[in-house]
Amino acid sequence: LKEEHADNAYVTYPFGFAKSVTLTAGAQAKVGQALNQARQADTRRSLEKALGPVDQLLGGHSDYQAANLQRFAVRPMTLAEARHDHTLIMRKDRITGTYARLFADIASIIVCILPTIVIIAYCYTDRRAQVRPTMQAKAMGTPKWLVTRYAASVAGLLIPVLMTALLLLGRVILLYPGAALDYWAFFKAAGFWVLPTLLVSTAVGFLSDALFSNFTGFALQIGWWLITMMIGAHQVIGNYGWLLIPRHNSLHNVSFFYAHYSELAINRLGYTLLAIVFLGLTMVLMNLQREGKYRGFHLRPARR
């Protein structure tokens, strides 16, 4: 806080992304007073009381809100902890696993929202071109038709993820020549960590198109994405739980990953099953559409 106050350049994290904030002279004076009070704080409660106004002046989502004060409680790793961390990186991660987690963290942020946009736009284009009635009239069952399109969409959207994984693997190989690397780490991370999020966001695209027949589903997915990002921002170096985007934005904290691996596995399995449920609901709606019993839920302004 002392450095940020001196530079009048504060960092907040609305929606999980860094934002620079500059304060007025009056607000700067209030931060200076809060800084003096924080220096004299000898309990967490008094520290929260001193720094709470700073968070309010910055518009919230800063390191100075009560929920984030534990970030200031830092201690050096002991020699035993450092050796354990190093052993996990070298023997279990085999170096590439460490980078693969960071890759999966960032890739998941992207695939949580982008596939929904692509699929809704894809379905909207079909509707504008009046392709949907022709396809629905053909003698192909709804399950086969939907699963084929879904699988093709997932495969197409996964290709850029795999290509990025390949490029990053090559970079790590160049950084650590002769090291015993796990050459499959990035691809395992793509399948285990990133793919379930991709499956859900793709399924949301098809479901929202069947449900609304417009771009309403995109707004709903943005809301889900923002909520997930804000929750995950509280602990980006290791936060799994039931987040659609499990966070591990660090090359370290390896012990946390292996200690919570089962939690992450349950999370990924749960979202894979959720994608299947969304696909099943889409199938039901599409059957109703083919039978002429449902034409989509449309939001219209109220008549005067």
Residue ranges and their predicted role:
Residues 1-58, 81-116:
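Membrane-embedded or membrane-proximal helical elements that form or frame transporter/channel pores
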Residues 142-143:
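Alpha-helix N-cap/start motif
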Residues 124-128, 167, 171-179, 212, ...:
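Membrane-interfacial segments
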Residues 1-22, 86-91, 95, 221-304:
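Terminal transmembrane helical anchor/hairpin motif
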Residues 53-115, 121-122, 147-214:
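Secretory targeting signals
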Residues 119-136:
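Transmembrane helix boundary and interhelical loop/hinge segments in multi-pass membrane proteins
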Residues 208-228:
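Functionally important transmembrane alpha-helices
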